[in-house]
Amino acid sequence: MILGLALVPSKSFQDEVNAYRKRYDNHYAQIMPHITIKPQFEIDDHDFNLIKNEVKNRISSIKPVEVHATKASNFAPISNVIYFKVAKTESLDQLFNQFNTEDFYGTAEHPFVPHFTIAQGLTSQEFEDIYGQVKLAGVDHREIIEELSLLQYSEEEDKWTIIETFTLG
């Protein structure tokens, strides 16, 4: 079973992000807009209830998270990914650090950069054109996310689905 943990924003902000993703993200149909808290990890099916309990325990002291998408940014030159940057907060860091440890399926491969991906899989020319447009349009969105979502990847459908949510705080 392949799982991941993410913060999923309100439907209205998902719609705003998806307006870009429909055009510029070749993974649009595979997963909803989200902030990755724990990248994919694999468990045995019989460990599922253990994972659910572990997630509940690890978030018991973490309050709902304020998310502020502040501007368009990118991961160039490492990869041609454009995203809405989310201001890093103590709560976001705490949530990320709870799940990116050796005792929970390993540490993160990359530093934590909270964001909502809006474009990926771009050529260099597409990247330059799209980044200029998105940067001009800008973003300034705030909301409180009260749940951490557990997602499962289906290899058959090549898609991520929320299978459980956990209330923060």
Curated annotation (Swiss-Prot):
Organism domain of life: Bacteria
Residues the record marks as active site: 34 (proton donor), 115 (proton acceptor)
Ranges spanned by the short sequence motif HXTX 2, renumbered to the chain: 115-118
Pfam family, one: 2_5_RNA_ligase2
Example GO molecular function: hydrolase activity, acting on ester bonds
Enzyme class: hydrolase
HXTX 1, short sequence motif: residues: 34-37
EC number(s) on file: 3.1.-.-
InterPro entries, A to Z: 2H_phosphoesterase_YjcG-like (IPR050580), Cyclic_Pdiesterase (IPR009097), YjcG (IPR022932)
Keywords: Hydrolase
Recorded family membership: Belongs to the 2H phosphoesterase superfamily. YjcG family.
Family matches, as NCBIfam families: PRK13679.1
PANTHER family noted in UniProt: PHOSPHOESTERASE SAOUHSC_00951-RELATED, PHOSPHOESTERASE YJCG-RELATED
Name this protein carries in UniProt: Putative phosphoesterase SERP0604
Species of provenance: Staphylococcus epidermidis (strain ATCC 35984 / DSM 28319 / BCRC 17069 / CCUG 31568 / BM 3577 / RP62A)
Phylogenetic lineage: Bacteria, Bacillati, Bacillota, Bacilli, Bacillales
